[in-house]
Regions:
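Conserved class I S-adenosyl-L-methionine
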Residues: 389-401
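Hydrophobic alpha-helical cores of multi-pass transmembrane domains in eukaryotic membrane proteins
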Residues: 401-402, 534
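Conserved SAM-binding loop of SAM-dependent methyltransferases across substrates and taxa
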Residues: 402-418
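Buried hydrophobic packing segments
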Residues: 372, 406-409, 554
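Class I SAM-binding transferase module
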Residues: 1-283, 287-343, 350-352, 359-360, ...
Length: 770
């Protein structure tokens, strides 16, 4: 795409002449008070005032509004004239079909600059948004308010401001404000109420500012990165190149869901095109028809061919050399900064596609398998007695879903060489059908299947002929009866069960807990405990999908002396963030249909955000190294050569950093809120259930948690919400983490969980503490 000015220098001359005439005529009076309408009325555009016409090529142009106006001027006449010019330009651009308009930002330095001027500029932009309902407005701002970029040119309206208005404000900026440009943008978009059609065109300087400022702009809706010719350096061959820091900046922005365009400024004309005095494209010199003469053609052929657009060629070459996307980047391509409602697997039966997304994780289930293998290895090595008298370790997966953890548990058992008594429990009737199919086709009938809510399950049972390892299918309906109740019906007389042994479905009988392969119906089955309890009930904030409530409800089935829970513990963490895109999506996209949209949490793959609480720059590297050293327990070693199948390829999870890697962001300060442990050592005394005396019931008061945290804010910014993460210890030495400070060391490349986002209904402006 190309840029084109919306108006010509002739239009500028007309406006300046009209303004000068008006001001010179009314030198002794304040015409802003004596006239009801605008003191200076700008006439409509004429054909000579604009190079644009509504044709087929108009969609390939970015319209640029006049840079000589001053929307933030303290002089009301200058500000009013500027608003009229902007309104005329955008109205005509919208008529022609321009969909992108580039508007120079407010003056950040110089006499008359103030916060009230920024608010005045924002009001003008808010009015401009109404000029074209389908037009995107890009506010052109520098990354920092560099005084060298704030030069005034001949014909600018700013010098026309009258002295009596300039005296009312502090003229010169006292010192360089690195966040001044961002703060001006923050005020503009806040006053305009975060419209989706208002974005940023960011001018990149030759010397990049600190990483904290780069990260702040990364979180904003930047749609254009503009590079001036002076930003480039020359290599040994004389071609323009960018520094490594600039390359890293571009690489980071390219990873955004909506990657910005790159706009090259003042890098020379496009071959074959030049402009006349009005900015209109004309043919290159040559014959009247645009063709070169014979002499010109011969001279062109005699010269060696050179790249006519070296800056453009370099940027295209840089684009092709971007690093290969990681598994996490490929998986999350469509999820970046996309608000999702957290799952409720306890109350809603999940669809197969939801399970499938989780099962694509290259890390999670490999780490679960390692945790199970370690637990089995330690169980036998420490000589712990098993709950099953036949010597097999009783392993139960509660909430089995489509069975990935069951498969991993069976593999771990084979690799370590420890035989297990495998149980799988699932309440979703649809997923339970698939589990039974897996038991036939994949697991070779090695798994006991139970359809039940884990909180009402009475645990594994052993028939009288327990020496036969017959695998069973159980079906718990809802009335609280199990196989013991069925066997003792009719005044204690055992009742024969007519069931099939094909394991293709639940028996269609009036019982509530049926043993599908009872060899001796007259015998009373014996319940026994679970040695290793496995679950994957964690949510994005650890406990937000009721993992503590569910596991507390099944803890009475766990071996009270040696029982192991995988996971063994988990901790929730939070940090304040700036997330303008998420705030705008909730404000405009969800609040209309759900008035409480800003008061519920969301699961989000956070990308275009900025951490507000970070370590000082001098401590970032040391903190990162300390975190890695303290949390990197190393890849859990396999217990046999066969167990190496769970190793993750180096290229996916632990690829070495390359020289083209983006500049690291500041290390966020992430606070710990609360933790849960399983088995829970402080579980209250259970009482008989209302459904059945054999199913204990406990209250949930012990799971209440509150936390108050304080975060230092090194740089001023706007807090839009709280980001939540978790860390979990599956088994000693095997951990999972979504905490950005520890994830790479504990479970790099994991994609099963996105962070949770707690939005603020009203944004909170944070001032710098340093």
């Amino acid at each position: 795409m190309l840029t084109s000015p919306i108006t010509t220098p002739q239009f500028q001359s007309r406006v300046l002449a009209l303004l000068s005439s008006t001001l010179s005529t009314h030198t002794e009076e304040d015409i802003t008070k004596t006239k009801n309408a605008s003191p200076v009325t700008i006439p409509s555009l004429t054909p000579a005032d604009t190079p644009l016409t509504p044709d087929e090529s108009i969609s390939q142009l970015i319209g640029v509004t006049s840079s000589w106006i001053d929307l933030s001027s303290p002089d009301p006449i200058i500000a009013d004239v500027s608003r009229q010019v902007l309104k005329l330009e955008l109205a005509y651009a919208a008529f022609c079909g321009i969909t992108y308009a580039l508007i120079p930002g407010p003056r950040l330095r110089g006499q008359g600059v103030s916060e009230s001027g920024f608010a005045q500029y924002a009001r003008a932009i808010q009015d401009a948004l109404a000029q074209g309902p389908y037009m995107q407005l890009y506010i052109w701002l520098p990354m920092i308010d560099d005084s060298e970029d704030q030069t005034e040119e001949m014909g600018d309206l700013a010098p026309f401001a009258r002295p009596e208005f300039l005296d009312q404000v502090d003229g010169e900026t006292k010192r360089l404000d690195l966040f001044g440009s961002w703060e001006a943008w923050d005020m503009i978009r806040s006053i305009c109420k975060y419209p989706s059609r208002l974005c940023v065109a960011l001018s990149i300087p030759k010397l990049l500012p600190p990483v904290a400022i780069q990260s702040r702009w990364y979180s904003e809706p930047v749609r254009l990165l503009t590079f001036d010719a002076k930003v480039f350096s020359k290599n040994a061959k004389g071609y323009p190149v960018l520094s490594r820091a600039h390359q890293a900046l571009i690489s980071r922005f390219i990873r955004l869901r909506s990657a910005p365009w790159v706009l090259l400024c003042d890098v020379g004309p496009i071959p074959g095109q030049t402009t006349d005095g009005n900015g209109t494209n004309v043919s290159a010199p040559g014959s009247a028809g645009g063709f070169p003469t014979l002499a010109e053609a011969a001279d062109t052929n005699s010269r060696p061919l050179k790249d006519p657009t070296p800056h453009l060629s370099y940027m295209r070459n840089l684009q092709t050399k971007q690093p290969v996307q990681t598994a996490l980047d490929r998986f999350g391509a469509g999820y970046q900064d996309y608000l999702q409602t957290p799952l409720q697997p306890l109350t809603v039966n999940l669809e197969s596609i939801t399970y499938e997304v989780f099962e694509k994780d290259p890390i999670k289930y490999a780490w679960y398998e390692r945790a199970i293998a370690r637990a089995l290895h330690d169980w036998i090595e420490q000589g712990k007695p098993t709950s099953n008298p036949d010597g097999r370790v009783v392993v139960a997966v509660v909430g089995a879903g489509r069975g990935p953890l069951v498969t991993r548990a069976l593999k771990a058992s084979e690799d370590v060489g420890v035989e297990i008594d495998m149980w799988a429990l699932e309440k979703n009737p649809n997923a339970f059908v698939l589990l039974q199919r897996h038991n036939e086709t994949t697991w070779n009938h090695r798994v006991n299947l139970v359809k039940s809510d884990m909180r009402t399950w009475r645990g594994p049972i052993r028939p009288a002929n327990a020496h036969q390892h017959a695998r069973r299918v159980f079906n718990v309906d809802g009335d609280g009866e199990d196989d013991n109740d069925v066997a003792k019906k009719n005044d204690g007389e055992p009742q024969s069960l007519s069931v099939q042994t094909t394991f293709t479905g639940s028996p269609s009988l009036d019982s509530t807990y049926l043993l599908a392969t009872s060899q001796n119906p007259s015998a009373t089955p014996t319940p026994y405990k679970i040695d290793i309890l496995i679950s994957e009930l964690l949510g994005s904030f650890a406990d937000n999908e009721l993992s503590p409530e569910c596991l507390d409800g099944v803890q009475h089935l766990l071996n009270p002396v040696h029982g192991i829970s995988i996971p063994a513990s988990y901790t929730a963490h939070i940090t304040p963030i700036a997330a303008p895109k998420l705030h705008a999506d909730i404000k405009h996209g969800m609040s209309s249909s759900n008035p409480n949209a800003a008061e519920i949490p969301y699961v989000v793959m956070l990308n275009a955000i900025d951490y507000l609480s970070t370590t000082p720059n001098s401590e970032t590297s040391a903190a990162s190294a300390s975190t890695t050293a303290s949390t990197n327990t190393g890849t859990p070693a396999p217990y046999s050569e066969a167990h190496t199948h769970s190793q993750v390829p180096q290229s996916e999870s632990q690829s070495p950093a390359s020289s083209s890697s983006p500049t690291p962001t500041p290390t966020p300060i992430i606070g710990t809120t609360w933790s849960f442990q399983h088995p829970n050592p402080s579980l209250p005394q259970a009482s008989p259930s209302e459904l059945s005396n054999s199913v204990p019931s406990i209250t949930n008061a012990h799971n209440a948690r509150t936390s108050t945290l304080t975060f230092p804010i090194p740089n001023r910014g706007t807090c839009h919400g709280i980001a939540g993460y978790f860390e979990t210890v599956l088994y000693k030495g095997v951990e999972l983490s979504t905490n950005p400070n520890t994830m790479d060391a504990k479970s790099e490349g994991m994609i099963s969980w996105f962070p949770i986002y707690f939005p603020l209904k009203v944004c909170d402006y944070e001032r710098s503490e340093y």
